Amino acid sequence: MAPFDFRKNKSMSSPDTLQIPTDLLPRDGRFGSGPSKIRGEQITALVADAPTYLGTSHRQATVRSKVGEVRDGLSALFNLPEGYEVLLGNGGTTCFWDAATFHLIAEQSQHLSFGEFSSKFASAAKEAPHIKDPSIITSEVGTHPTAVAEEGVDLYALTHNETSTGVMMPIVRPAGATGLVAVDATSGAGGLMVDANEFDCYYFAPQKSFSSDGGLWLALCSPAAIERIESLAASGRWTPAFFDLKITLDNSRLNQTYNTPALATIHLLASQIKWMNENGGLSFSSGRSRTSAEILYSWAEASDFATPFVTNPADRSNVVGTIDFSDDIDATVIAKVLRANGVVDTDPYRKLGRNQLRVAMFPSIDSEDVASLCACINWIVGNL
Ligand SMILES: *Cc1c(COP(=O)(O)O)cnc(C)c1O
């Protein structure tokens, strides 16, 4: 037997120097849940259009037609029924929550709160002095509650995919409810199937399934949601212009935003929507995520050191997978080794505090790369 070589042993087990064999590595190492992977073709298309597009006025035809492409493309992708409209504004989803407290919630909202993001809209509604305290239904992290029709509630706030825990929920109108159904689909939109008849407002930001950058919000609004916006705007309720959804509506109808948007973000978004629509629409894009999810969860279930965090298989998200590790393995070390090898952002949601990795499986992420990631994790655990 060869004499014990301390240096060799150290280089084999220190996370900083563990080198994953290149044939195991995914072709693209981006697995972050937002901002997330942007496809090379989107960048190429942006670069090609740059000389006549970037650095030009958002009030002129070139940019406005790109915004029009986004609005029409989303209507097609989500098969929006007659009368639904696509609104967009600056500030991302977090800004939209505040806008919703002014111009979507009339008196009282009900929130399903089952993680960091869904709880944030509930807090925004609770803080707003001009509406009643919301009704909040919570459930354990790793599960989701169910909305129930409630007297006095005029808006039901659902979350398609709770990005902090990796739980997805079906979008259905609560039985017997008369209020609007507003869905935070920031991480779910484009990666999960949805029926537009089941919502009045399906809102998101483009840095997740839509492979663009942050800072913008988009909302698919039913005629009932538009009517609510118009009546609250006419009600005399004081509203800062930035959160005024009537101003947003008027600008969106002209393919503009109230103030200057990031033009690159809109271009990248338009490319992604086009890619989805040209390849078969939402069944194509959500199908890619579903295939990736099947790979990730079946790997974890077969593993003797990893398990899906979400117990109910139906609740396990197709777009953001959360995987727990057994106590003898430190997930932060795995994430660190992966990062040192160019495979990034698999860290769990910071406030969840579990021995876990979180893997984005948005439509842009190739399923073969998810399979490679699983192989890399197996290799790291075997070599630590
Ligand atoms: C990322 C995310 C948000 C926050 O989006 P911002 O654009 O950063 O405000 C909100 N809700 C969900 C479900 C998310 O995944």
Model-assigned labels for residue ranges:
Residues F6, K10-S57:
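N-terminal "arm"/small-domain region of PLP-dependent enzymes with the aminotransferase-like
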Residues F6-K8, S13, D28, K351, ...:
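PLP-dependent enzyme catalytic core of the Aspartate aminotransferase-like
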Residues K37, Q207-Y297:
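Active-site C-terminal subdomain of aminotransferase-like
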Residues A50-A99, E116, K120, A124:
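Conserved N-terminal alpha-helix of the aminotransferase class I/II PLP-enzyme fold
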Residues T94-D154:
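PLP-dependent aminotransferase-like
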Residues T138-G190, C201:
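Active-site phosphate-binding strand-loop segment of PLP-dependent enzymes
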Residues A196-Q207, W217:
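Conserved active-site segment immediately N-terminal to the catalytic lysine
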Residues T307-V337:
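Conserved PLP-binding catalytic core of the aspartate aminotransferase-like
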